[in-house]
Amino acid sequence: MVVLQPDPFLSELTSMYERSTEKGSVWVTMKRSSMKCQARLKKMAAKGEAVEYRCLVRATDGKKNICTALSAKEYLKFQASYATVLKAHMHALKKRERKDKKKAAEVEKIPEKAPKKQKKAPSSKKSAGSKS
């Protein structure tokens, strides 16, 4: 996994989104990380120092993995830039219209049926005037 600075990370993320426009996906994960060894964290906590947690941002398109680590101060600037990248590539999130193969086949096979003409039932009236 390649660890990048925030600006190169965003430019690489943009190229990942562009490659996956027609086919594919990009997964982005964010999580809190101390990025320091546990012994060092315990010493800092014992001294009463504030532990600075970093935000770890990872992205992958299934083939290439990139990541960056952000401090709390960098995070707000990064979030604004990241939102701009997402808005620029939202068109890839729209659902594509797909034809259902079964429904299309049924429509082609069954032509529209014309309404059936109803036959008149023979009248049960007897003619009273004719004798033969």
UniProtKB/Swiss-Prot annotation:
**Region feature Disordered, mapped onto this chain:** 93-132
According to its UniProt record, where is this protein mainly located?
Answer: cytoplasm
Keyword annotations for this protein, in alphabetical order, are: Cytoplasm, Ribonucleoprotein, RNA-binding, Signal recognition particle
**InterPro entries with a match to the protein in the record:** Signal_recog_particle_SRP14 (IPR003210), Signal_recog_particle_SRP9/14 (IPR009018)
UniProt-listed GO biological process terms: protein targeting to ER; SRP-dependent cotranslational protein targeting to membrane
* Basic and acidic residues bias (residue ranges): 103-115
User: What do the Gene Ontology cellular component annotations say?
Assistant: signal recognition particle, endoplasmic reticulum targeting
Q: Is the keyword Amino-acid biosynthesis assigned to this protein? A: no
Q: Name one GO molecular function term.
A: 7S RNA binding
Pfam family membership, one: SRP14
SUPFAM superfamilies in UniProt? Signal recognition particle alu RNA binding heterodimer, SRP9/14
* Comp. bias regions, Basic residues: 93-102
Localization of this protein: Cytoplasm
How does it associate, per the subunit comment? Heterodimer with SRP9; binds RNA as heterodimer. Component of a signal recognition particle (SRP) complex that consists of a 7SL RNA molecule of 300 nucleotides and six protein subunits: SRP72, SRP68, SRP54, SRP19, SRP14 and SRP9.
Question: What does it do?
Answer: Component of the signal recognition particle (SRP) complex, a ribonucleoprotein complex that mediates the cotranslational targeting of secretory and membrane proteins to the endoplasmic reticulum (ER). SRP9 together with SRP14 and the Alu portion of the SRP RNA, constitutes the elongation arrest domain of SRP. The complex of SRP9 and SRP14 is required for SRP RNA binding.
Q: Its family?
A: Belongs to the SRP14 family.
Protein name (database record): Signal recognition particle 14 kDa protein
